[in-house]
A protein has these predicted regions:
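Append "Primarily bacterial transcriptional regulators
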Residues: 11, 30-35, 43, 82
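DNA major-groove recognition helix of helix-turn-helix
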Residues: 11, 15, 47, 54-58
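Basic, amphipathic alpha-helical hairpins
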Residues: 17-24, 85, 119
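HTH DNA-binding helix-turn interface
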Residues: 19-24, 37-54
Length: 147
């Protein structure tokens, strides 16, 4: 395993541990680095900010589910995935605004939903509306369910 991946995983593990006891908004990059014995320079070499790290965790752990061809089964898998790490995602989904995980998740789920409903409408505008509606609904439902 490359050193870069080891470093990223150590930072991810530290963030997940910290998020068990405090919200993401209260955790600093310094806290994450202190927890795993790394310096801030190492953190910023790999990630722009703590929100980028949250997105990397999601991408890394979720890629297997996201890449399956059977999207209907994926919805159950998505729920199981979020539930298995609910403390982490409960906190991550509370953040709104720039670089938020909510927006990142919507962006990641968008192509899956687009493929799923792409043939229902003749109009691209109608398809886009439904995909956005479903993505927003998934985020809201996950937040409610995890809380």
């Amino acid at each position: 395993m490359p050193d870069s991946l080891i470093t990223k995983r150590a930072l991810a593990s530290s963030l997940k541990e910290l998020m068990k006891t405090q919200p993401l908004t209260k955790i600093s990059v310094g806290d994450i680095c202190e927890k795993c014995g790394m310096n801030r320079k190492s953190f910023y070499y790999h990630f722009c900010d703590k929100y980028d790290l949250v997105n990397w965790i999601f991408d890394t752990e979720f890629s297997e589910i996201r890449n399956r061809p059977d999207h209907i089964a994926n919805f159950e898998d998505i729920c199981e995935y979020f539930y298995s790490d609910r403390e982490f995602y409960r906190s991550a989904l509370q953040i709104t605004g720039q670089n938020s995980f909510r927006d990142y998740f919507r962006m990641q789920i968008h192509p899956v939903l687009e493929e799923l409903v792409g043939n229902l409408f003749d109009s691209e505008e109608d398809t886009e509306f439904l995909v956005t509606f479903l993505a927003d609904g998934m985020v809201s439902t996950l937040i409610r369910w995890l809380n």
